[in-house]
A protein has these predicted regions:
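Hydrophobic, aromatic-enriched interface-forming segments
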Residues: 87-136
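Glycine-rich, often proline-containing surface loops adjacent to acidic residues and nearby aromatics
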Residues: 2, 31-34, 61-70, 116-134, ...
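A generic structural motif
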Residues: 41-43, 57-59, 69-76, 127-139, ...
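Internal mixed beta-strand/loop scaffold within catalytic domains of large alpha/beta enzymes
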Residues: 1-65
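Gly/Pro-rich turn-and-neighbor structural signature
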Residues: 1-22, 128, 133-184
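A translation/RNA-centric and nucleic-acid-associated enzymatic feature enriched
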Residues: 179-195
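Compact, glycine/acidic-enriched structural inserts
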Residues: 59-103
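Short helix/loop capping segments that flank catalytic or ligand/cofactor-binding pockets
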Residues: 15-17, 46-48, 75-78, 190-193
């Protein structure tokens, strides 16, 4: 199953949440718009994918987002391809983006109570405002394009493979870890609850 959600929200941050968001010192008001894709395939041979980008306006404005891949069974070729596509999205804009955003992804998508990463990583960025809105927006769009290229290639390579009941059980366990992360650690989930 694949879910794609486009949301635009506005309002006022609560007193207890305001100090966690940049640019709210003078005003608690915000506007945010984003697109999010979460793909959990029926086949345990096909990884789960997550992608989101957003633009947020408070007293300041910025882009954020990223993409990551969570396979049930690690396939190094898939991991290499996914990271190659993320690097292709980043490189034209700044040579430092990919290593910096990959590191942030590795740190962010981590289950500290289990001492394990959620998946094989990707990129994660926030508070992006270089002063050139058009270039920043072009980067965000390229992250989406390259994510789609990676997903399409990987899904097409594995979608027809057969699997066993034991492999399906492994996939369900991995999905449980995914849910744990979202409920315990995900800033986007918290933002949605708080707004």
């Amino acid at each position: 199953k694949v879910g794609v959600n486009i949301s635009t929200v506005s309002g006022q941050f609560s007193e207890d949440y305001r100090d966690k968001i940049k640019g709210t010192e003078k005003s608690p008001h915000y506007w945010a718009s984003g697109i999010s894709l979460v793909a959990h395939m029926q086949s345990p041979k096909v990884p789960a994918f997550h992608f989101n980008t957003r633009f947020l306006v408070t007293g300041e404005s910025w882009f954020g987002g990223g993409a990551d891949m969570t396979p049930t069974f690690v396939n190094k070729d898939d991991t290499t391809l996914f990271h190659q596509k993320m690097e292709e999205a980043c490189r034209p804009y700044d040579e430092t983006y990919y290593p910096k955003f990959k590191k942030r992804c590795d740190e962010y998508f981590y289950l500290p109570h289990r001492n394990e990463p959620r998946g094989e990583g990707g990129i994660f960025f926030d508070y992006m405002n270089t002063g050139d809105w058009e270039t920043d927006f072009d980067f965000v769009k390229d992250v989406g394009r390259k994510t789609l290229e990676a997903i399409t290639t990987i899904v097409n390579q594995h979608k027809e493979l057969s699997w066993t009941a034991q492999e399906k059980d492994e996939q369900l366990l991995k999905r449980g870890r995914y849910v744990e992360f979202n409920l315990l650690w995900d800033r986007g989930t918290l933002f949605g609850i708080k707004t």
